[in-house]
UniProtKB/Swiss-Prot annotation:
GO terms for molecular function: actin filament binding; ATP binding; ATP hydrolysis activity; ATP-dependent protein folding chaperone; heat shock protein binding; protein folding chaperone. Its main location: cytoplasm. Disulfide bonds: none annotated. GO terms for cellular component: cytoplasm; cytosol; extracellular matrix. It comes from Dictyostelium discoideum (Social amoeba). It holds the Pfam family HSP70. Keywords: ATP-binding, Chaperone, Cytoplasm, Nucleotide-binding. Residues 625-634 have a biased composition (Polar residues). GO terms for biological process: chaperone cofactor-dependent protein refolding; protein refolding. It is found in: Cytoplasm. SUPFAM superfamilies: Actin-like ATPase domain (SSF53067), Heat shock protein 70kD (HSP70), C-terminal subdomain (SSF100934), Heat shock protein 70kD (HSP70), peptide-binding domain (SSF100920). Belongs to the heat shock protein 70 family. This is Heat shock cognate 70 kDa protein 1. Interacts with the heterodimeric F-actin-capping protein CAP32/34 (acpA/acpB). Binds via its C-terminal tail and interaction is ATP-dependent.
């Protein structure tokens, strides 16, 4: 069974598969090897990827992106609250404190969870792979930032389930990138590799050792909330201020203007990676005012100076955590599109005392590449080339439970290699205590109130005894996906309780996932129907125009009687008029119109053929013979 590797990115996603003894990164239907993580909803259809991103300025409130910045988070998170200020689409709390996205779709208000939006992007990646491989794909390895916590990982897995993918493994993005790097560089002793991954929305630094195909993550740090979009935001704010200064007008209230400016800023940022200056030219940006301006690389670097410098903090942290100094790093590998920014490269190189950075792997594709290798290993497909690779990943955050006085007692410290299992014995706090409440947290702070509650459960039925006598054995078990199971057992009675950390944190229940899978299937069918509808419409339109033009051909005009000519003219004219006012008719309406038009046209055309009035091979669609008007359906997809 083929399995694919998917890099589900904040701004762009990428898919790869192991084939012919190597990884192939698969281009989408637009020929692009990365696909925007965008989903758009219009009056007539749902668009995913390039098509969604290309119409964002016309439809900002119903075009959803950055779902990765919402997935597995709470609505009240301060990051979510601050992001919402930048998003043109509407985010609302639902089911307690879960963020959901509200859009208008086919004239109705719809509400989607971040998992559902991400599942639509995953579906697009799945379909891209299926179109290339010519078969159905069910299995995938999906990557997440190393710093994603338990709920963000679980929610990503749920998104896979909704898109009908069996998620074989969730792996960390920097680990995947290290595989991409390591596969190219096998052998040659133990190496310490620093992976510096700065993408569109997240930033990860990981330190790994690679030796004889064993990848061991020593430490990981980062910011789930720093990336190319934050640099875009700085540019947007800069130009909004400039527009205010020049024209005394604030464009912030106009979403379309802001969106057009953001697109121009993203383009300028990319230009500045290779040029010292970039110009921005936007016609009629706001209230008819053209906005022509430029920005230098130096100015851009100044606008983002604190963000760029901040990229070094996690680098220092992983060195400290893995107890290594800068000199003992053998390779610094750049991953993520934002590592193309010269200033970022310069700061990193200076930090490592001028050491050359490794740019041998494609920063946009490395993560999907590594995920595809891992997918091949898990489905026993990669053969000898990958068989001896072993991935030892780590838990990004400490996990433990609350003990008396709200103290965090850690069972699994962060950067512990996973999968792993730890057991510790606890007791009661007061005499004759009938039960204990096991509250599971993740985080690095001393008090649980400052950490993140993962879930809780009660172990009851403890026989009366003085405090400190009962023995409750608590086991933390982290699987290879970084997902935690906790169990507690009262040693005197053998009474046992356990919890898989899933739903307590605004996670999706099994029922919700099943409902979302069904919804996803429904949307997919609607997408198919929409495609069929558009094809029938285009077919009718092409046919009408071809017929209309064919009677203007001199040879035909000479042979055709005036009455036949006017019949054809009036029929095609009325069909074209009807088409103008019925752009959203159903497929069978278009087909009926087609049949009716053919019924009028065919007898006239076959009469011409018999009289030899038709030019050979091509006056009519496909050089029609009298019984095959349908040869007009050699389909050419037209672009609007």
């Amino acid at each position: 069974m083929s399995s694919i590797g998917i890099d589900l990115g904040t701004t762009y996603s990428c898919v790869g598969v192991w084939q012919n003894d190597r990884v192939e990164i698969i281009a989408n239907d637009q020929g692009n090897r990365t696909t925007p993580s965008y989903v758009a909803f219009t009056d007539t259809e749902r668009l995913i990827g390039d098509a969604a991103k290309n119409q964002v300025a016309m439809n900002p409130t119903n075009t959803v992106f950055d779902a990765k910045r919402l997935i597995g988070r709470k609505f009240s998170d301060k990051e979510v609250q601050s992001d919402m200020k930048h998003w043109p689409f509407k985010v609302i709390p639902k089911d307690g404190d879960k963020p959901h996205i509200q859009v208008e779709f086919k004239g109705e208000t719809k509400v989607f969870s971040p998992e559902e939006i991400s599942s639509m992007v995953l579906l697009k990646m799945k379909e891209t792979a299926e179109a290339y491989l010519g078969k159905t794909i069910n299995n995938a390895v999906i990557t997440v930032p190393a710093y994603f916590n338990d709920s963000q990982r679980q929610a990503t897995k749920d998104a896979g389930t909704i898109s009908k993918l069996n998620v074989q493994r969730i792996i960390n993005e920097p680990t995947a990138a290290a595989i991409a790097y390591g596969l190219e560089k096998k052998g040659s002793g133990e190496k310490n590799i620093l992976i510096f991954d700065l993408g569109g929305g997240t930033f990860d630094v990981s330190l790994l050792t690679i030796e004889d195909g064993v990848f061991e993550v020593k430490a990981t740090a980062g910011d789930t909330h720093l990336g190319g979009e934050d640099f875009d935001n700085r540019l947007v704010s800069h130009f909004v201020d400039e527009f205010k200064r020049k024209h005394k007008k604030d464009i912030m209230g106009n979403q379309r203007a802001v969106r057009r400016l953001r697109t121009a800023c993203e383009r300028a940022k990319r230009t500045l990676s290779s040029s010292a200056q970039a110009s921005i030219e936007i016609d009629s940006l706001f209230e008819g005012i053209d906005f022509y301006t430029s920005i230098t690389r130096a100015r851009f670097e100044e606008l983002c100076a604190d963000l760029f410098r901040g990229c070094l903090d996690p680098v220092e942290k992983v060195l400290k955590d893995s107890k290594l100094d800068k000199k003992s790093i053998h390779e610094i590998v750049l991953v993520g599109g934002s590592t193309r920014i010269p200033k970022v490269q310069q700061l990193l190189q200076e930090f490592f005392n001028g050491k050359e950075l490794n740019k041998s792997i494609n920063p946009d594709e490395a993560v999907a590449y590594g995920a595809a290798v891992q997918a091949a290993i898990l489905s026993n497909e990669g053969g000898a080339k990958v068989a001896d690779l072993l991935l030892l990943d780590v838990a990004p955050l400490s996990m433990g439970l609350e003990t008396a006085g709200g103290v965090m007692t850690t069972l699994i410290p962060r950067n512990t290699t996973i999968p792993c299992k730890k057991t510790q014995t606890f007791s009661t706090y007061s005499d004759n205590q009938p039960g204990v409440l096991i509250q599971v947290y993740e985080g690095e702070r001393a008090m649980t109130k400052d950490n993140n509650l993962l879930g809780k459960f009660e172990l009851s039925g403890i026989p009366p005894a003085p405090r400190g006598v009962p023995q409750v054995e608590v086991t933390f078990d982290v699987d290879a996906n970084g997902i935690l199971n906790v169990s507690a057992e009262d040693k005197s009675t053998g009474n046992k309780q356990k919890i898989t950390i899933t739903n307590d944190k605004g996670r999706l229940s099994k029922e919700e996932i099943e409902k979302m899978v069904a919804d996803a299937e429904k949307f997919k069918q609607q997408d198919e129907q929409q495609k069929d509808r558009v094809e029938s419409k285009n077919k009718l339109e092409n046919y009408a125009f071809t017929v209309k033009n064919s009677i203007k051909d001199e040879k035909v005009a000479a042979k055709i009687s005036d009455s036949d000519k006017s019949t054809i003219e009036s029929e095609t004219e009325s069909v074209l008029k009807w088409l103008e006012s019925n752009q959203t008719a159903e497929k069978d309406e278009y087909e009926d119109k087609m049949k009716a038009l053919e019924a009028v046209v065919n007898p006239i055309m076959s009469k011409l053929y018999q009289e030899g009035g038709m030019p050979q091979g091509g006056g009519m669609p496909g050089g029609m013979s009298n019984d095959s008007p349908k040869s007009s359906n050699n389909k050419v997809d037209e672009l609007d």
